[in-house]
């Protein structure tokens, strides 16, 4: 019997929406009989932009903008066809990027 392993990587700007999506995936996998490892929180990616507030005067006055990308990793082992079918039917909120790899 071939054991399938599914790796799901989730990314979002809002960590609350991301955690809700992870919980929804975990509940679905547990109901369909899959073995789950995770969620594993990956390092948060932080991007910062520095912008001048004034076009010509007061050059030392700057404003900083920041964007954070939160990530989670879920491994599903012993995935059955029912598990894969259930994962395909999940509707996740907008703003959550999902990457699925089968091995």
Swiss-Prot record:
Annotated GO biological processes are:
translation
Q: Give the keywords, sorted.
A: Ribonucleoprotein, Ribosomal protein
Provide GO CC annotations from the record.
ribonucleoprotein complex; ribosome
What is the top-level taxon of the source organism? Bacteria
Q: InterPro entries, alphabetically? A: Ribosomal_uS10, Ribosomal_uS10_CS, Ribosomal_uS10_dom, Ribosomal_uS10_dom_sf
Q: Example GO molecular function term?
A: tRNA binding
What is the protein's quaternary organization?
A: Part of the 30S ribosomal subunit.
Role description: Involved in the binding of tRNA to the ribosomes.
Write out the similarity annotation.
Belongs to the universal ribosomal protein uS10 family.
Report the protein name in the record. Answer: Small ribosomal subunit protein uS10
- The source organism is Persephonella marina (strain DSM 14350 / EX-H1)
């Amino acid at each position: 019997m071939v054991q399938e392993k599914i790796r799901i990587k989730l990314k979002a700007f809002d960590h609350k929406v991301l955690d809700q999506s992870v919980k929804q995936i975990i509940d679905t996998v547990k109901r369909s009989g899959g073995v789950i490892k995770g969620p594993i929180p990956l390092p948060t990616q932080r991007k910062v932009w520095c912008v001048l507030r004034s076009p010509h005067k007061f050059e030392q006055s700057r404003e900083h903008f920041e964007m954070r990308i939160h990530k989670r990793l879920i491994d599903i082992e012993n995935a059955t066809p029912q598990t894969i079918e259930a994962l395909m039917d999940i509707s996740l909120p907008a703003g959550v990027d999902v990457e699925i790899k089968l091995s």
